[in-house]
Amino acid sequence: MDPLVLSLVVVVMLGALAPVVGSLQVALAGIHGLRNHLRRSGACLPRTVVVVPAWNEAAVIGASVDRLLAMDYPADRLRVLVVDDCSTDATPDAVLERVVRHPGRVIHLRTSEGGRGKAHALNEGLARALADEWAEAVLIIDADVQFEDGTLRRMTRHLADPRVGAVTGYIKEGSHDPGFLNRFIAWEYLDAQAAARRTQDVLGGLACLAGGAQLHSRANLEALGGRIDTSTLAEDTVTTFETQLAGRRAVFEPAAVVWAEEPPDLHALWKQRIRWGRGNVQVTRRYLSTWFRPWTRRGLSGVLFGLSWFTVLLQPLFMIASAVALLVLLAIRDDVAWVVFRAVWLTHGVCYLFLVLSAFVIDRQVATRCWREGVLFPGLVSVVIIGYAAVQAVTGAWGVSGGHPVAWLLAGWLASCMAVAWLAMRLETARGGRWWSRALLYLAGYGSFLCVVTLAAYVRELRGSDNRWEKTEKRGRALLAS
């Protein structure tokens, strides 16, 4: 085969890398039942301070504090410290009401200077918590989350092993009236947390302690200087990496379930995920000396961990490169183009089928509620293309002529789907645009939306945009079950 054609074939196949790596993650997650930290855990109920950063959280903070105090955990071993970041709504009133109702168990701390972001508020709370020798562990949560009974106990049991520095739980989308977007997010979390973090546990390296539920031993926080990094938009991930690079384990506890309210519309989700995406780019640069060095340490430096991280981070570029290469192939060797096209999309189809079926094993509750969003995660157009490729494989028929407009549409879809997903977000606030926005998202796929967000995060980082914290508005929609 001509070297140019061979090179183009290799680039086209990059378009199938993400579902292949995702399927490998899910397959490895099955080992978690046999290879996990439970055998080293034990009865452990440390005196725990729950640090809750809050800025204008009047709609949710009261219910969250009440739920924390009602948890199945010894009352004399649990305190709640709400760090009020100079809220301008009724947040202080809601907290102070509970300070009076639960003297000694609820503490209200108003920051010295508001509006600097979550990490700065957390640092003031951590300084207060660690100044008192009473605290043996610190639980950092978001103001809107709701803990299931037994969740904290399931997390603290891992601290019986002194090698463990931090534990995170399984965050579930918990809106009591979930719309189609919330169901997509619920499905995403099933894959990104319930599956991926199990795999990371097996590999010995955790990518991120969930901001809504991360438990630290006092020793771990003190080893980190008693502070959270404020120079990045991914302070949770930096804390996770620093914990493990310092020699302590970070553990995922899938049975520690926490329900959270997620953005109800694409614009709010865009702001949240831009922050996450930029944070991941910052983390990637910060830890360049860590990636793909399995001879130095397992876990974060492992090949599989790095492959998973960079597949997600670079997926938009892989999709664009794959589409462009396929279009070039279509122009110069349409016979080869159709063979590679079929290979890419059949790989997508087999992997997505495996992922959807596996979801019912990993979390039947979420999978049963959101299976339609799971099937349509890659988008309706992609599902149709997978079917078209399957028909080609069965019948042996080639595609339409290389000069036909449909051929160019099929070849370029891996890239153009991101443009359609971006348009769905832009139309959401237009007059009469919400229906079109929803229709376009179903056509392009929620996965395509996540990719275009990552692409936008690249651009903002290249421009050197400010690390401004874009707060996600909470409306008190989270319940313990959904």
Segments predicted by a language model, with ranges:
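N-terminal membrane-anchoring/stem segments of glycan-assembly enzymes
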Residues: M1-C44, A424-E428, Y442, Y446-R463
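Membrane-embedded multi-pass helical conduit in multi-pass membrane proteins
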Residues: R40-G42, T311-E461
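Cell-envelope/extracellular polymer assembly enzymes that use nucleotide-activated donors
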Residues: P46-V49, R79, V238
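Acidic helix N-cap motif at the loop->helix transition within catalytic regions
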Residues: G62, D89-R98, K118, G150
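Short, acidic, metal-binding catalytic loop of nucleotide-sugar glycosyltransferases
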Residues: D66-R77
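A conserved acidic beta->alpha catalytic loop
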Residues: A75, D84-D93, S112-G115
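Long helical/loop segments within the catalytic core of UDP-sugar-dependent glycosyltransferases
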Residues: P103, R110, G117-E136, D149-L233, ...
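The conserved acidic donor/metal-binding loop of glycosyltransferases
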Residues: D142-Q146
